[in-house]
UniProtKB/Swiss-Prot annotation:
Residues involved in Zn(2+) binding: E191, H264, H280
GO biological process: amino acid biosynthetic process; aromatic amino acid family biosynthetic process; chorismate biosynthetic process
Record's protein name: Pentafunctional AROM polypeptide
Gene Ontology terms, MF aspect: 3-dehydroquinate dehydratase activity; 3-dehydroquinate synthase activity; 3-phosphoshikimate 1-carboxyvinyltransferase activity; ATP binding; metal ion binding; shikimate 3-dehydrogenase (NADP+) activity; shikimate kinase activity
Region (Shikimate kinase): 858-1048
3-dehydroquinase as annotated region, ranges: 1049-1258
Length: 1551
């Protein structure tokens, strides 16, 4: 047993080794005499074999060496949330009860929580007893156990109450780490990296080299720590040595010890917000990068050091950004709470601060801190580094002169790395660009064993030992982010790679944008020369699968080089390694960016291979076979593209700037920017062979450049564009030769046009360029922050360019995604700040909780399913709702082949038809990829090719919708269809054969019920549209803000209660389907059950599969079937899917990642009532739900006493991060169900097991009885109102839901009388307002809805905090009446409004909301209509019809609303115009029958209704429907409850 001892404060009390339990016991018993030894640990550690061995050895040795002494053990609950006053007190009470005295020795065996808290217990118990620290986590070994800091947490922050109390010993037994989960292991490495970063550069280098082996071992299924035992012990030892040395110099943290807090100022603040989901080390890792960036921002730390630190942390699996993908998975929606102000407040109360002044440790280089102390930093600088959005303040007083050295050229850096990796020997590469691009390149080269890569000069020099082109596969995907250069160069390099045991191919992939960028011409050229390359996603773009071992044949290679010169350079650099010498011929016209091709040839020469240009063939190169010979040193020239930004700064501000290492001899085309662009625009340019100086004219005096061809320097066009924006003169500035910029990180030409417009600068695209119409600098507009400022498009050059124009505005300009500049110039913002003295601020955008889910765009939707399942009809509805075009692929095939399908099959057979069908499918999926609904033939899934295309479409974000219906109905339909070939087998057999394929090929599934009436058909359309809204993200389910209830359907077959569903769902805001209780859980049965619900209830569905262990019937062991059922729920478009917190992590992650727009309810149920609500396990379950990003957390306990319900209420108050459904079961738990707010489960006497939950009536009555509801009065006001049916409607609803409310009539013509008698009373609940008070009542409304403001009238008033809210529900009454009558909620058809009164305004608003392209207005007097038109926005597209001729010319109208008095005859002239418009709309239009709504509900049938229906065959809707539908919405506003629609409808209609 080898033990290393580390001195601290003059004593060798820190012992480090592997498997040293015996040593710990002997050392303590021999040297720390005591009557009582107490080992304190947590319940997790107590279950480990290492802990058992320690305690057993202690007991054995104690009985032998000190038989008079005793050993006590005590366990606390695990976790940071138990490191508090209460737990400390419990430990102290135990010690007192056991009669422990001042000679007690306490052993703290555990992680940092145990060490900190039990150390504090020892510091205060009996005024201080001896303590021994036995850390069992890596973090505790290297950090918390060393130095004597002890503490507990408080609600205000971590470690705010504690003491310095040095342990007698610290025993770091590395074998304890065998029990550590991988995440905890990785967590500890943050502190290890930290100590090396602040103190020991040599150890930091060792850690860089150890990372891969470390991560491989600790993340394996069965970690073998013995295999890295020596390195692990050294890792702990070296880190402990640093901390021990610092503590010995500064025990009480008066100065030097503050250095150990590097990364902790920001890290602790993040941790305080994200604990316990985020671990200490993870937060410190992010904090280190942010504090390193702060050092760089202040001009102290070189950019290379930040890049090196970041790379090292990432190599250990640690996050370096709050928005790290894996880190976000862990913290979930808590990310929302990481706000600048909150972090700054947390930092302001950090213990190492001087008062409220925030102090940070600043790095000077790896291994050394700046001035060996913490420094005061400004909140403004902290805000900047903490955000990815930046406010650029006006350039008020920039320095007159500046010298700027840009980073190394990205182009040269990437080429140098390829050449060095392919070469023989060692080369020291200096001034390499340390950016995202080169990081990806370095990682890829290392992964392919192309070279051994190390660093010197604190990371400034990259040492590359090339392997002479002997590369082999690694078995790992090579992820290249958005690094276009790396992707193109590595594609050819990958063709040279040999096979290894790890893999037979190389896969290159990147981020979403990278997978859109073109690489086709290069792949084509390589493919023709022997490479085997497969596109894994989109044709012509990454990801690519490149077969290893083929190499390049050599000989003549033809390549199209008009899009990217990088294709050329890629082949040029790899050509010497082909089997034969290469002749590279560039075809298709003049190559783009010739200077970059010349650069590549020049660099190849530096590495020993000379390219010769053909003397007989234009754009052709000869490359000999050979191997590169690496020079001893290669210095990368600074990036000329990057140099354009500081030079442009000088041009735009009238100052001077020098780039000392780029001149006329540069290899880079962009080096000519100053001479060819800035000089003609009025700048003074001085350029030597090695330097460039630009002096701008006085501010505002730049001249436009009528035309400049920037083909030799295309990347610089963005810089030129922002300079041209403020160059006002006699002409515009035209830049051409830059067509390739459309396929860079974004479409840069389009981006510049779009963003320049935000500054008020007109610009337009040219075929191969851009034209900018410069404006006076004083006329620049400041882009609106409320509209998200300036987008960078995740493009470094866009961000840097607009940072220049931003500073010329009069107000600060917001630029998004500033970190994108890390691609080529990570320190650009630091240069602006420290060199150009520009004021920058961080900016935090408002948080959007759904931002991780993008609403579906205009991507086409493919519809599949059996013939006769309604594909054509539902596809038409789908197209109508989305505004898409409809394409029947069977018809398209028939038109293409010039024959009918039936004839085709008869002539050539089914197999031929399936082949043609697959060809057409591929063509349609590509040709009609946007804005279409593609309805396929029923048998498309029969062909393997077609199936693969469908699967690929779904896998890549497209919707493939499977439609199905009852098979008996399908058979009936098909029997009558003679237009299609008959099946050779029965429908049932065909279905059984295809069923699996339909499910495999689709990602969504809709089961449509049989409809036998028009009402059922209309209801089906509403249900289908609601389904489409959800799966496309047009509408996401909203978690109710107030009280809400969900009726739990426990029937094994809903068809048994189908006739009672209307009654059963009264008062429910959702329906919970207990799928585990169904008599059959096959996909078809479950889909049919959901169809039953959708047919009879317009309510969101909560889809629950409860397992046996959680109180349900579904077998826990059937995990795969459970997963399939949950995924089926998502496919079926349910609003909420219930996901048990007890499910395997893999299942939770898969459902969470595939949920689409469905919300997730994370549920845990303690069916046996074992947990009290003050037990930490409930908190852990809640945190688990939050961590997995559940939209709602549901926790169900069991009450054994009334106190259990009160404890639950206390729990709810403390846990508010996510909406919480929490209640107790059992007879004693009813109170908790009444007090629950969100989706309280309710039952009904008609359901099985109805006694478990209350009915809606019982729930509301009990809530009223305990004071939850107060009795309220509601009124309809106006005159005359004696016949108003509003009281009937509302009171019927109150009665059905058992609400303690009354609705009455109050006749009034004066709103002040209403205020005094109704509004000003304590029991006032709300008003329904009719004429003549809809305008007058508005003076009492302190807040208005958008509808009320636009319509200009209020018909609903409710009390809100501090005043009253006014709304207008008339428009809802109109739109919902249409929708319930079968009209789609969105339609691009035209509308007609007859009349010019108040209701007409509501009708116009409603038709606009329903998507009407144009709304015609007809009235007896046109003057009133003109006033009406003026009061609405222009985009309403209102048109007055004054004459019969205008009526004749009107487009077809599908929707009409009559808002004229029904008790008077129609005006003759008005009638003529109406008739002409009605006659023009009589044809079926927009997928539904033209429909007229009568706004008057008396008489039941009005003259215009009679005329419209009988003469013109329109569908008509009586006015009573509008009354019911507006009352339905009004009821919700008044009470917060969903009205029982059928009941309120009967109360009005059957009066």
């Amino acid at each position: 047993m080898s033990i290393e001892k580390v001195p601290i404060l003059g004593k060798e009390t820190i012992h480090v080794g592997y498997g040293i339990a015996d040593h710990i016991v002997r050392e303590v018993i021999a040297n720390l005499a005591s009557s009582t030894y107490v080992i304190v640990t947590d319940t997790n550690m107590a279950r480990t074999p290492q802990y058992s061995k320690l305690t057993d050895d202690f007991k054995t040795n104690l009985s032998e060496k000190r038989p008079e002494s005793r050993l006590l053990t005590y366990c606390v609950s695990p976790g940071e949330n138990n490191k508090n006053r209460a737990t400390k007190a419990a430990v102290e009470d135990f010690l007192l009860q056991q009669g422990c005295t001042r000679d007690t020795v306490i052993l703290a065996v555990g992680g940092g929580v145990i060490g900190d808290m039990i150390g504090f217990v020892a510091a205060t118990f009996m005024r201080g007893v001896r303590v021994v620290q036995v850390p069992t986590t890596l973090l505790a070994m290297v950090d918390s156990s060393v130095g004597g800091k002890t503490a507990i947490d408080t609600p205000l922050g971590k470690n705010f109450i504690g003491a310095f109390h040095q342990p007698e010993y610290v025993f770091c037994d590395v074998s304890f780490l065998e029990t550590l989960p991988a995440r905890q292991f990785i967590n500890g490495m943050a502190e290890v990296v930290k100590t090396a970063a602040i103190w020991n550069e040599e150890e930091f280098t060792r850690l860089e080299n150890f990372s891969k082996k470390f991560l491989s071992v600790v993340t394996s299924k069965k970690p073998d720590l013995q295999s890295i035992k020596a390195e692990l012990v050294k890792t702990v030892l070296e880190s402990v040595r640093v901390k021990a040395g610092v503590v010995s110099s500064d025990e009480k943290e008066a100065g030097l010890r503050n250095l150990l807090n590097f990364g902790h100022t920001i890290g602790h603040a993040i941790e305080a917000v994200l604990t316990p989901e985020a671990l200490h080390g993870e937060c410190v890792s992010i904090g280190m990068i942010k504090e390193a960036e702060l050092s760089r921002y202040l001009g102290i730390l070189p950019p290379v050091a930040v890049a090196r630190l970041s790379k090292c942390l990432v190599a250990y699996g640690l996050p370096v950004s709050i928005d790290d993908k894996e880190f976000l998975k862990k913290v979930g929606p808590k990310r929302h709470y990481v706000e600048i102000d909150i972090l700054l407040k947390k930092m302001a109360i950090d213990k190492k601060n001087d008062g409220s002044k925030i102090r940070c440790v600043l790095l000077e280089k790896i291994g050394k801190c700046y001035q060996l102390k913490a420094h005061q930093v400004s909140k403004q600088d902290l805000s900047f580094v903490l955000t990815d959005e930046v406010l650029v303040h006006p350039f008020t007083n920039p320095p007159k002169e500046n010298i700027i050295v840009p980073p190394g050229s990205k182009s040269i850096s990437n080429r140098a790395l390829i050449l060095a990796a392919l070469g023989n020997g060692t080369v020291r590469v200096k001034n390499l660009l340390h950016s995202d691009d080169t990081k990806h390149m370095l990682d890829a080269v290392a992964s392919l064993k192309g070279a051994e890569i190390s660093t010197e000069d604190n990371g400034e020099t990259i040492v590359v030992k090339g392997n002479g082109g002997n590369l082999v596969t690694s078995g790992e995907e090579l992820y290249l982010g958005n690094a276009g250069t790396a992707s193109r160069f590595l594609t050819t390099v990958a063709s040279l790679v040999g096979k290894s045991q790890a893999s037979d191919d190389v896969i290159l992939t990147g981020n979403a944008r990278m997978q859109e960028r073109p690489i086709g011409p290069l792949v084509d050229a390589l493919g023709s020369n022997g490479s085997e390359i497969e596109y894994l996603n989109k044709q012509g773009s990454l990801p690519l699968k490149i077969s290893a071992g083929n190499g390049l044949k050599g000989g003549r290679i033809e390549l199209a080089a008009t899009i990217s010169s990088q294709y050329v350079s890629s082949i040029l650099m790899c050509a010497p390694y082909a089997k034969e010498p290469v002749t590279l011929a560039l075809v298709g016209g003049k190559p783009i960016s010739q200077l970059y091709i010349d650069m590549t040839c020049a660099m190849m020469k530096s590495f020993g291979i000379e390219v010769t240009k053909s003397t007989t063939e234009e754009y052709t190169y000869h490359i000999p076979k050979g191997t590169y010979k690496n020079p001893s040193e290669y210095v990368i020239e600074s990036d000329a593209s990057s140099a354009t930004y500081p030079l442009a700064f000088a041009a735009m501000t009238g100052t001077s700037c020098t780039i000392p290492n780029i001149g006329s001899s540069s290899l880079q085309g962009d080096a000519k920017f100053a001479v060819d662009v800035l000089k003609p625009m009025g700048c003074k340019v001085e350029q030597t062979t090695t330097s460039t100086t630009v002096t701008g004219p006085p501010r505002g005096h730049l001249k436009p450049l009528p035309h400049v061809d920037m083909e030799p320097m295309t990347d610089a066009f963005l810089t030129a564009s922002v300079v041209a924006a403020v160059a006002k003169g006699g002409s515009s500035t035209s830049i051409t030769g830059i067509a390739n910029q459309r396929v860079k990180e974004c479409n840069r030409i389009e981006a510049m046009v779009t963003e320049l417009a935000k500054f008020g600068v007109p610009a337009n695209e040219l075929p191969d360029g851009i034209e900018i119409h410069g404006i006076d600098i004083e006329d620049l507009k400041t882009p609106e922050i409320s509209k998200r400022g300036v987008s960078s498009y995740d493009d470094h050059r866009v961000a840097m360019s607009f940072s220049l124009l931003a500073g010329l505005c009069k107000e600060p300009v917001l630029i998004l995604e500033r970190s994108t500049t890390g691609k080529t110039w990570p320190g650009w913002w630091d240069i602006l700040h420290s060199k150009f003295k520009i004021e920058l601020d961080g900016y935090e955008p408002p948080f959007n909780t759904d931002k991780h889910v993008d609403k579906s765009s205009d991507k086409s939707i493919i519809v599949i399913g059996m013939r006769g399942t309604g594909k054509s009809t539902l596809s038409e509805w789908l197209a109508s709702f989305l505004g898409f075009k409809m394409l029947d692929m069977d018809k398209y095939l028939e038109e293409k082949l010039g024959t009918g399908i039936k004839s085709l099959i008869k002539a050539k057979g089914w197999e031929y038809f399936r082949q043609e069908e697959a060809i057409v499918a591929k063509e349609c999926f590509t040709k009609f990829s946007k804005g279409y609904v593609l309805s396929t033939g029923g048998g498309i899934v029969e062909g393997e090719d077609a199936r693969q295309q469908l699967k690929s479409y779904a896998d890549n974000g497209g919707i493939v919708l499977h439609l199905h219906r009852d098979l008996d109905e399908t058979v009936t339909f098909l029997a009558a269809d003679t237009t299609r070939p008959a099946y050779s087998s029965e429908v049932q057999e065909v279905w059984l054969r295809r069923e699996k394929w339909y499910h495999e090929c689709s990602n969504y599934h809709f089961y449509s019920s049989h409809c036998s009436t028009e009402d059922e058909f209309n209801h089906l359309r509403r249900s289908f549209v609601n389904y489409i809204k959800l799966i496309t993200g047009a509408e996401r389910p909203v978690v109710p803000a107030g009280r809400s209830a969900a009726v739990v359907l426990t029937s094994p077959d809903l068809n048994e209660v189908v006739g009672d569903l209307e009654s059963i769902t009264i008062g429910a805001d959702a329906v919970e389907l207990r799928v585990d209780l169904f008599k059959d859980t096959s996909a078809e049965f479950v889909a049919a059950q959901i169809a039953v619900i959708r047919k009879h209830a317009d309510l969101p569905i909560i889809y629950t599969v409860r397992t046996v262990s959680q109180g349900g019937k579904f077998p826990d062991e059937n995990v795969d079937e459970l997963k399939s059922l949950l995924l089926l729920g998502i496919r079926l478009g349910v609003a909420y899917v219930d996901l048990q917190l007890t499910a395997p992590n893999e299942l939770i992650e898969e459902i969470s990642s595939k949920k689409g727009f469905t919300r997730v309810i994370g549920t845990y149920q303690d069916i046996n009532g074992e947990l009290k609500w003050n037990n930490v396990e409930w908190k852990n379950k809640y945190n688990q739900g939050v961590s997995m990003n559940a939209d709602i957390v549901r926790l169900v306990g069991k009450a054994n006493s009334i106190q259990d319900n009160l404890d639950l209420e206390n729990f709810k108050k403390q846990n508010t991060l996510k909406p919480l459904i929490a209640f107790n079961l059992g007879s004693q738990g009813k109170l908790s169900q009444v007090l629950n707010g969100t989706f309280t489960p309710i039952s009904h006497k008609l359901l099985p097991n109805d006694e478990e939950f209350l009915t809606i009536g019982e729930l509301n009555q009990t809530y009223f009885d305990i004071g939850g509801f107060t009795a309220k009065k509601f009124w309809v006001i106006g005159s005359p109102i004696e016949h108003s049916r509003s009281p009937n409607l509302h009171n019927a609803g109150y009665k059905a839901l058992n609400l303690p409310y009354q609705f009455g009539r109050f006749e009034a013509t004066d709103v002040d009388v209403v205020y005094d008698n109704l509004i000003n009373k304590p029991d006032f609940g709300g008003l329904a307002i009719t004429m003549p008070l809809k305008l007058d009542i508005m003076k009492f409304a302190t807040k208005l809805s958008d509808a009320a403001e636009t319509i200009g009238a209020v018909n609903t008033l409710i009390p809100i905090e501090g005043g009253y809210f006014g709304d207008n529900t008339d428009w809802v009454g109109i739109s919902n009446s249409f929708i319930r009558a079968g009209v789609p909620p969105k339609s691009s058809s035209n509308g007609l409004v007859v009349g010019a009164g108040g209701t007409s305004r509501a009708a116009i608003y409603a038709l606009h909301q329903m998507g009407c392209a144009k709304i015609y207005l007809v009235n007896r007097t046109a003057a009133k209509l003109e006033e009406l038109v003026k009061s609405f926005p222009k985009d309403y597209n209102l048109e007055i019809v004054e004459t019969e001729q205008q009526a004749d010319k009107a487009s077809k109208v599908s929707l009409a609303v009559s808002c004229i008095p029904a008790d008077k005859p129609l005006d003759g002239e008005v009638l003529k115009k109406i008739e002409r418009i009605l006659s023009n709309g009589s044809e079926q239009s927009a997928g539904f029958k033209p429909t007229l709504l009568e706004a008057s509900y008396k008489p039941r049938v009005t003259p215009i209704m009679k005329l419209t229906e009988e003469q013109y065959k329109w569908k008509v809707i009586p006015g009573v429907e509008m009354l019911v539908n507006q009352g339905d919405r009004q009821f919700k506003l008044h009470t917060g409850f969903t009205a029982p629609y059928e009941i309120i409808h009967r109360a009005v209609v059957e009066e």
